[in-house]
Every structure is written in C-alpha cells, then in structure tokens.
Amino acid sequence: MSFLPLRSRSRSGAPHWVYIILYHIFTIPKIYSLPLLSGSHVLNSRDVADSGHSVGDEASVTTYYIISIILVLLGGVFAGLTLGLMGQDEVYLKVISTSGSNSEKKLAKRVLDLISRGKHWVLVTLLLSNVITNETLPIVLDRCLGGGWQAVVSSTILIVIFGEIIPQSVCVKYGLQVGAFFCPFVLVLMYLMYPVAYPIATLLDYMLGEDHGTMYKKSGLKTLVTLHRTMGVERLTKDEVTIISAVLDLKAKRVEEIMTPIENVFTMSADTILDDKTVEKIFNSGFSRIPIFLPNEPNNFIGMLLVRVLISYDPDDCLPISHFPLATLPETSPNTSCLNILNYFQEGKAHMCVVSKEPGSSHGAIGVLTLEDVIEELIGEEIVDESDVFVDMHQHIMRQQPGPLSKRHITSYLHHLYTSSHKEHKAADQADESSPLLSPSNSNHPSEHPQQDLNNKSWKQKSNDGYDRSNAVLSPTPQVTEHGTIIPSNLASNPLNVNKSFVTIKKPANVPKIITTHTPHSSKEPSPAPHSNDKSLSAEEQQLLSDHAELSRQAVLHTQRSGQPTQVTTSTKTTRNSPDSISIPNSGANHGNENQNVTISTSYQNTKNGIVESVITVKGVPKTIIGPAKDWDESKSEYGNENINQENSNRSDDRESSSSNASLFSSIKNKFKNENANNNDRSNFTDSLSRTSNYDANGSSSTIKR
C-alpha cells in the first residue's frame, strides 16, 4: 500500500487532508441552516422538551387564551363604537335630546357630551385602539397555537366575525344605546391616548373642518316631511304634510299669487246710500269687510266697512257709507311676502289689504288680500264660513247649500231684531237701556251734533266669547270723539284682553316720544294764504323742510343709540283734528276758503316681523303702505351686544342719515309739487299730502300735510 498521496504536499507545504477538513467545517453550518433541516431540528428540540414536561405549562397557555378572547372582544367594541358614535348625526342627537322620550333624552345627552369634546378626537382614539388590538392578537395566538399559518388564519377569522361583522351589525341598529353605555370607557381612552390622538385630531379639524351634523334646505325639509307620510313609526297624515310644506313655501310666495283680483272684489263708493236694497245687497254678498273707494275713483280706496257696524242700523235712515266709521285698509306691493303680510295681520290693525302696483297712489290697485286667503294657502283648502256665497272666489264656484240663516230673510230679520230690541230697552230699567244709532225723527236729516243723539250710558260685561270686557267701557253703537269723528268701540290700536290661553293678540308698539317745534305767527305777519296751484314751495316751507331735516337727523341718532322710538313734528299751526283719526271727505264741501296748514312729521320705530308700515295721504285720503324690511331676519341682535362697535357705527350713521334725509325731503318736495298741480281734478274734497313712515336704525321717514 502506497502512502504517497497522503504524504504528498502542496506547493505551500500543507497536506491536502487539512484542506478537506477545513472545507467540511465551514460547510456544515450552511447545510443545517436550510429551512427543512432547521424546522426538523426545532421540532426535535421541542419533542425533547415535551418529553420532560408532557404538554407544557398549562397555566401560561390558558392565560394566552384568555388574553386572546379579551383582545377579540375589545376589537369588536372599538369597531362597533367607531360606527355607532361616528354614525350619530349631531343634529339628530339634539332633536332627540329635546323631543324624545326620557330614556332617549338621557342617552342623547351622554353621547352629545362626549362628541362635543371633539368628534375627530373620538375617532382617532377608537381607530388607534382598534389597530393596536388587531395587531396584538396574532402575537398572542402564536404562543397558543405554535405559530405559523395557524395563528394567522385563526386571528383573521376571529377579527372578521367577532371584531367586525357582529359588532357593526348591532351598532347599526342600537348605536345610540351602545355608544351611551361605553361613553365613560371611551372618555378614559381619550385621555390615555391624548399625547398621540389629540394632535392628530387637531390637524384633522384644521384640514377638514368641524362637522356639526346634517342641515337641510327647505326643499330637503319638504322631501323629508313627505317621506314621513309613508315611512317611520309615527306617520304624518296628508293634511299635516300639506300644511308643513305650505309653511315652508310661505315666505317665498308673493301676495300677488294668492290675492283676489280687483274685478272680483265687492266694493262700494263712499257716497252710497245704505237703504233697504243696498243693505240687502251687502248681506247677500256674504262678506264681512267691504273696501270703500272715493266717488268716481274706483281704485282710490279710503278704508273698509265692517259689516258688523250695521247690526244696529235702521235702513230707513238712508245714511251714506261715509257716515259710518271705516277701518284702515292698508296697501302693499305685489312682491310682498305672504309671511310678512301674515305678521302684519297678527298685529290686529287690519285683516285685509289692497295689493297695488303703486302703493299710496290713487290708482294701481290690482287685488285684495285677506287673512282668510293666507290661512287657505297654509292649509291648502278653501275655508267656507256660514255667510260665504262662493266656495272659491277665483273660480266663481258657488256653494250648493245656503248658510244657517237664509240670505233672503236676513235684512228683515235684522230689522225686526233692531225694532224689538229697541222696544225692550224702552220697557227695561233706565239704567240699562240704550238708544238707537239715530233718532227716527231725524232719520232723513242727521243731527249736527251726533254725540247728543247717542246715549251716554255704558256698561261693563264679560261675555262668553273669550274677551275680558271687565275693564273696557262698551256701548251698543260706535263712540264719538270730541272732534266728532266716529270710531269703533274696540279699536285695533288698543285690543281687548283675551282669557283663552291658546289665543294671542300682538299688542301695537309703544307711543313714541314727541319732539315738536312750532313756527308762531305774530299779529303783524299775514296768515297763511289759501292753497294755490303754485308748482314751487315758498321760502317759509323750504325753511321748514330744512329745519325738520336737521331735527330728523338728530332723532335718528337718538333712536340708534337708545333704541327708543322717536317722532319729530313741525307745524305752522295747531291742527284741529287728531292725527290718529281718519276723516272721510264729504262731497260738496267747500274747502277753498279755509286756511291751510303744513305739518311735517317723521317717526322712527324699530322694525318688527319683517315689515315697515307707512301712511300716505293722497288727495285727502290716508293710505297705509306695508313693505318688507331689508334683511330683517338676519339682523336681530340686541342693542346691548353692540356696545364695542357703537362709536364707529354712530359716525357712519351720521353720514348715512344726512344723505338719506336729503334724498327723502327732495322726493317729498317733488311729490308735494305734483299734488299741488293736480288739485283741480277734485275741488270738492280736502286737498292734502301727507307721508309718514316707520324706520329702524337703517333709515327714517317723514310726513307732510298740506
């Protein structure tokens, strides 16, 4: 046997077997590092460990199982709360907290208190907690199931079923209850994760903005109300849906759309004699308010006749309509909102108005609007009372069945009621009797002193009609003032109190303060000349306008600073009639020789209910004009909240009021000239021009009477 190869040497001098041994030493770790051999080696090592301890430490395995179950439940809670709390609309929660049941109010207040701390803060806290839980679960299951694909599959199944599907399905239906129950737990987590969650939530608020819930437009609200008719537990009826939808459209709807055209309106002239035929015609018309116009001017309305005034009138007296007190008949433009006109009707001043293209002029009337028209628009149906002849005035649909009292006998019935009541009062106690409106002996010639023809006795009563008349002095006929003007016993400016809690009467505004300046006439100065047809104002009248403009500017500043209504009046002499009374001009009266006076009156009042009321007297006829206020519903801030910016606003108001007064009195001069030029058209009536307007802090108004 030859040992030559073993003894052979390399060029370096080292034997070959040395290299072979070193090669095997360095390649052994690479072979055993393969996955198959490595796994079998680990498995063999565990078998060796299991052979000494059988199944292993059962206590630690049980602990891992319990931790896994807790993590699965926490993941489900976080996933459900994310949907339950974030899915709650803040507006819906506010509605439930005020109008829900007692239990719903408590739950909604808990959730609102949590969300009010920051909706993004709650969201980041829940998402961060859910991620931590889901990432920890596979690690714990690896200790229980031995790792590998078993832990991955098990954690996935548990998270999907018990951490997502079941919790979110429950919270979709019971999100409010579940969210309110876990509110304390979520609040603790929010503060535990404050260092991480709050900065992220602040960044989201800055980038995305805060979410305060879903707000609907009017069209969306109408759709929502309509859906409540067919869906939900408490379904709305058809009438409820109609009324709610009509209310939402009331502000955008114009009075021109619901008015009665002027050609379909029952009107009468002021010189109409109320005989048997005319009274029967009035009662057969079925109207309780009749617009009255000047003779030969069918579009120049001076007021409205309340039919109830004729309840004690004897048609044999044959008195003209101008003899009776007429209620104020305001005028408004066709573009006035129905909501604004409804607010005006609620003030108790009038329940009828004239729709005119040129409010305040002697022409331009296109229709009439009543409170009943607005209410009919609200309910979407026609209202037919006992005395109505037409079911629908616009379509001329007459009612098929008459009212409770036949129209054919109503005149004779009222006449019989009047005469029988008169006889009973004569036979009754003298303390309780009341005389008729006019003495029968003077029926054809009315007394020159109507107050002497009325009984001065009055009584106090409390009837079952809902009105408290204990503090009101009433009379069976309209009262007569010291100026001879007949006014109703229950004035709209001072309505009676109502005992019923469900009835509300809006009281008129307080009487404004008066700032009056007079221009005295000495004995040397000539009295004001009678009215002429000059087309220019005299120097004295222009000076009055200039002085009044300065006083008006000061009054505007006073009203803006104090918030109190103010009135400025400048006159050349004291007027005989009360400014609040309305005198109806009588035909045939000669006013050409009477001394004329000039009265300029400006009133400043806070605008209410979105309307500005003005009074214009054209050719002796006072007209009330109703117009919408500018941005009235966006400017309701109290005076006390504007103290900081008051100084700056007063400076700007000085400039604005000066310019507004200049333009205002310029227009008054022009209109005054135009009226003077056209006075020959009606020489038998009092020639006058008057303008009074109510303004808030945004403007002013003026009155001129000539």
From Swiss-Prot:
Positions of the CNNM transmembrane domain: 57-240
PANTHER family recorded: METAL TRANSPORTER CNNM, METAL TRANSPORTER CNNM-5
InterPro entries associated with the record: ACDP, CBS_dom, CBS_dom_sf, CNNM, Ion_transp-like_CBS
Major location (coarse): membrane
Protein name: Protein MAM3
Vacuolar side: 1-16, 87-120, 167-177
Ranges that cross the membrane: 17-37, 66-86, 121-141, 146-166, 178-198
Primary role: Involved in metal homeostasis and more specially in manganese sensitivity.
